[in-house]
């Protein structure tokens, strides 16, 4: 019987890359269109607008570096936003930039990753790539784009494109602390791999100059990143205070990170963000995290280089969470991103027998179920993304944009405004593109400076506003993010996903002598109601 298989030709060999490109283009296009909908319904919150305000008020990169000295973040994302802010004064431009980065990440996964098409679709539309690191404009997306680009370029063995790899690692180091941790783990993985094979060491010796330049570039990027993340002496936060504030989470709180990252399904409520269905059951999440950890280790236990990457990266993330900063889901999510990177890189390595018989046996027995377990995790991520996107479609992430639009509609945007708490009201200042008075720190500003000046005692906000109105003979608008029952608000904006960005507005008017109109009728003030 003759085989029906077609003979392999150059045309057939080229059809598969073409099909891959078309699939990647279609998947990326769908991602882009759906993400546009997400962004159109996303009101930016303070952590997004803080960077924009810094860039808007900086006349040079040197001034930007000075203003952001309290932020504790490297500057790659800030420099990108600064370049965009030279072209537009609308913060939506930053969202467009972030959308471009998220879309490029989706394309890298869709085109270059070794996963089957179904898994690619689930990865791209998972919680972190579709919502957390796409709809919300922060520096995390840049680090993840560079991580997956590293995976796309990486090849096992000594003949690597070290120059390109180190560029991605350096950009990761300059993105945020979590990307820096993963970049260090990837660099150590390359060293670990080289130590395992004699031919790798010989090849590296022949390219010693190129390798030395790559090492110097990466270490320089790490040094600059750490230098910029170091808080000034007058900062209102430091690593030691973070340690004492968050160490109480204990072992269970730290281990729960794995469950939160791998199964980020939130509570179906309007304040879903950073929540989990098992929230409040920390010990249960810790136990499930240990189970997930053991199973995930078995995924890589027969691929030693990838296992080294996974254990070193995950161990560093857990230590950072336990000893430095407990963080939120957006930080914990890097554990799952690391898992995806290890799954990607693991496709390139042949399996090797593990020396511990019990672990080897468990890995062999798990092998037939790996794809189904991986699909289950990816499906859970998509469910989380769907819940988040549906709620965010109906509920404003922050009330800052609505409050800002209200002030413009009532022609109150140019009034003297007192805002507290500064970190919450800074979102309104960002949307209004103007400075307001922050009692915390006793200064005018749009962004927040996290220095110790803002921690000094202050007088009650409404009393301060009344004194200001009397002294300056000028009406004062007070914006609080916590209702003051002693005063009557002229408007309130409640129900945001970020609960601390609900707002209450109070108008403090100067006392004017009572007058009558020529007709003898009392003058009625203009209504401020909606």
Regions found by a protein language model. Give the residues of each.
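Membrane-interface alpha helices of multi-pass inner-membrane proteins
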Residues: 33, 63, 129-133, 148, ...
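Membrane-interface transmembrane helices that cradle and orient dolichyl/undecaprenyl
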Residues: 149-164, 194-198
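Short acidic/glycine- and proline-prone juxtamembrane loop motifs at membrane-interface regions
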Residues: 135-142
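Transmembrane-helix motifs of polytopic, lipid-linked glycan transferases
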Residues: 96-121, 294-297
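Signature aromatic-anchored transmembrane alpha helix within multi-pass, membrane-resident enzymes
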Residues: 216-218, 290-291, 315, 351-387
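Short hydrophobic/aromatic helix or loop-helix immediately within or flanking a transmembrane segment
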Residues: 52-56, 60-96, 100
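Transmembrane signal-anchor helices characteristic of membrane glycosylation enzymes that use polyprenol
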Residues: 19-48, 216-232, 319
């Amino acid at each position: 019987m003759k085989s029906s298989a077609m003979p392999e030709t150059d045309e057939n060999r080229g059809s598969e890359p073409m099909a891959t490109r078309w699939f990647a283009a279609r998947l990326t296009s769908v991602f882009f269109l759906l993400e546009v909908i997400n962004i159109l319904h996303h009101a930016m919150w303070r952590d997004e607008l803080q960077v924009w305000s810094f860039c808007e008020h900086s006349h040079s990169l040197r001034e930007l570096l000075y203003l952001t000295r309290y932020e504790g973040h490297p500057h790659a994302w800030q420099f990108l936003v600064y370049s965009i802010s030279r072209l537009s004064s609308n913060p939506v431009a930053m969202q467009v930039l972030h959308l471009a980065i998220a879309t490029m990440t989706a394309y890298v996964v869709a085109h270059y990753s070794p996963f089957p098409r179904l898994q690619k679709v689930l990865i791209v539309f998972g919680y972190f790539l579709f919502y957390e690191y796409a709809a919300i404009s922060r520096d995390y997306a840049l680090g993840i784009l560079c991580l997956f680009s590293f995976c796309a370029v990486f090849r096992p063995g000594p003949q690597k494109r070290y120059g390109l790899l180190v560029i991605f690692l350096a950009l990761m180091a300059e993105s945020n602390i979590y990307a820096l941790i993963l970049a260090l783990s990837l660099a150590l993985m390359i060293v670990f791999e080289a130590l395992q094979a004699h031919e790798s060491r010989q090849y590296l010796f022949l390219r010693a100059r190129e390798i030395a330049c790559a090492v110097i570039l990466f270490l320089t990027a790490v040094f600059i990143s750490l230098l910029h993340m170091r808080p000034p002496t007058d900062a209102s936060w430091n690593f030691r205070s973070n340690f004492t504030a968050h160490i109480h989470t204990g072992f269970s709180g730290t281990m729960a990170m794995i469950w939160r990252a791998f199964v980020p399904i939130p509570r179906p409520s309007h304040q879903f963000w950073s929540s989990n269905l098992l929230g409040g059951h920390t010990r249960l999440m810790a136990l499930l995290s240990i189970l997930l950890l053991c199973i995930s280790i078995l995924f890589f236990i027969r691929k030693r280089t990838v296992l080294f990457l996974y254990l070193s990266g995950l161990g560093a993330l857990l230590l950072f969470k336990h000893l430095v900063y407990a963080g939120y889901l957006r930080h914990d999510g890097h554990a799952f991103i690391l898992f995806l990177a290890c799954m990607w890189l693991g496709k390139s390595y042949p399996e090797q027998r593990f020396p511990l018989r019990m672990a080897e046996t468990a890995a062999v027995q798990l092998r037939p179920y790996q794809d189904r377990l991986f699909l289950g995790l990816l499906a859970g991520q998509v469910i989380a993304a769907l819940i988040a996107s549906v709620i965010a479609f109906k509920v404003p992430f922050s009330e800052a944009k609505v409050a800002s639009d209200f002030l413009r509609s009532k022609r109150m945007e140019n009034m003297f405004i007192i805002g507290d708490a500064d970190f919450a009201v800074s979102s309104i200042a960002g949307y209004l593109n103007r400075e307001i008075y922050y009692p915390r720190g006793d200064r005018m500003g749009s962004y927040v400076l996290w220095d110790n000046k803002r921690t000094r005692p202050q007088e009650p906000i409404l009393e301060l506003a009344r004194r200001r109105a009397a002294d300056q003979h000028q009406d004062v608008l007070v914006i609080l993010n916590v209702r003051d029952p002693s005063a009557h608000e002229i408007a309130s904006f409640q129900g945001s996903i970020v609960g601390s960005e609900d707002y209450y507005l109070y108008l403090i008017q100067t006392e004017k002598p009572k007058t009558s109109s020529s007709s003898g009728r009392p003058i009625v003030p203009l209504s401020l109601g909606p």
